[in-house]
Amino acid sequence: MGRPYREAIEGLIGVSNSVVFSHGKESGPWGSKITAMAEVARDLKFEVLSVDYRGIDDPQTRVHKLIETLSAPGTSNLYTAPVLVGSSMGGYVSAAAAATLWPRALFLLAPAFYMPGFEQYTPQDVPAPTTIVHGWHDDIVPVENSVRWAREHRATLHVLDSNHRLEDQIPTVCALLREWLKSLP
């Protein structure tokens, strides 16, 4: 990410040490991936929140829920410049909310970018360093979508021998998350 973003984040007083998870459309706030990644974050002394989007199918409504959750009275100090982690639609939600929330960084799993009929909604103004993890055999969100977004936004991209859910790669995803969280400024 560019110098102005880094200076803006470093200038914040009380930047939180929190990780906020956003699950995918067919999942829940404490599925196996989020549960495993939350353990990693807690082990590194991060506060953890997983937003519950069950029953909300509209991606934009989910974006508004994330923004409202992190902007609610009493949460401002805890969630100043949080780390956003999202899977599939949750990856889209995290990236779309980034322009409002100014996160410290994003870690996205198979984010739902450039989906047919929704290409125009793919987030373009993401003001934070971003890492993407995607499966080569994803039959829901083509891996090419993440390659394209990563190239256009200079994001870090890890492509694993897995499918959309990455369930057979949870230990690898957690290892990537651990090293990534440890590297954050």
Per-region residue spans from a language model:
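Post-His helix in hydrolase/transferase enzymes
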Residues: T35, E167-K182
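Conserved alpha/beta-hydrolase "acid-adjacent" motif
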Residues: W30, D139-N145
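Catalytic histidine neighborhood in serine/cysteine hydrolases
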Residues: L49, R151-D168
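Short hydrophobic segments within beta-strands
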Residues: F21-K25, V85, L109, V133
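Primarily recognizes the serine-hydrolase "nucleophile elbow" in alpha/beta-hydrolase
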Residues: L70-G74, L78-V126
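Active-site nucleophile loop of the alpha/beta-hydrolase fold
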Residues: G24, Y53-R54, F107-P116, S162
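Serine-hydrolase catalytic machinery in alpha/beta-hydrolase-like enzymes
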Residues: P4-A81, Y92-A97
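Short beta-strand/loop motif that positions the catalytic acidic residue
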Residues: V126-P127, I132-H134, D138
